[in-house]
């Protein structure tokens, strides 16, 4: 993973856009990125946090497993890894998401790919806002916040 880098200066969306989407070793673009940006900004404002930048990097299981092994010393597949670069309430970080896991989890949970992707994307933002999910109480709070955020998505034009 010598090529791991901060994604805030890449050319895709430009450094002026605080929410950027990239793909690493896969061909993927989220549906309706403009709507997703407005939604994420609304959630961050709802959490009374300050957005500096969030980079979403969509990848496959292999890529995310390597990050998990190298940076977290976990030898397991995961759907998301969030790297915060600032303490809350400042939102600044990279969110790596395995599209392979999103497909599999959507099937397992009986939801659409888009629903699962939205939940995982906002899960990363909530980590950057300061929410944890290490113990049962924190997991319950995180799920509640995800549900609130998903309801906010319905209010975004």
Residue ranges and their predicted role:
Residues 1-117, 129-157:
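An acidic/histidine-cluster motif and surrounding catalytic segment
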Residues 122, 126-130:
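Short active-site segment of divalent metal-dependent hydrolases/proteases
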């Amino acid at each position: 993973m010598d090529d791991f880098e901060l994604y805030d200066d890449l050319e895709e969306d430009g450094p002026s856009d605080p929410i950027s989407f990239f793909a690493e070793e896969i061909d993927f673009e989220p549906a309706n990125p403009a709507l997703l940006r407005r939604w994420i900004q609304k959630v961050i404002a709802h959490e009374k946090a300050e957005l500096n930048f969030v980079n979403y990097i969509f990848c496959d299981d292999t890529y995310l497993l390597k990050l998990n092994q190298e940076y977290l010393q976990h030898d397991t597949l995961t759907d998301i890894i969030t790297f915060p670069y600032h303490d809350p309430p400042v939102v600044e970080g990279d969110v790596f998401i395995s599209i392979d896991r999103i497909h599999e989890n959507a099937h397992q949970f009986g939801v659409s790919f888009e629903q699962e992707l939205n939940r995982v994307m906002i899960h990363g933002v909530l980590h950057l806002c300061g929410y944890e999910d290490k113990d049962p109480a924190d997991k319950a709070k995180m799920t509640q916040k995800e549900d609130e955020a998903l309801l906010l998505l319905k209010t975004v034009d």
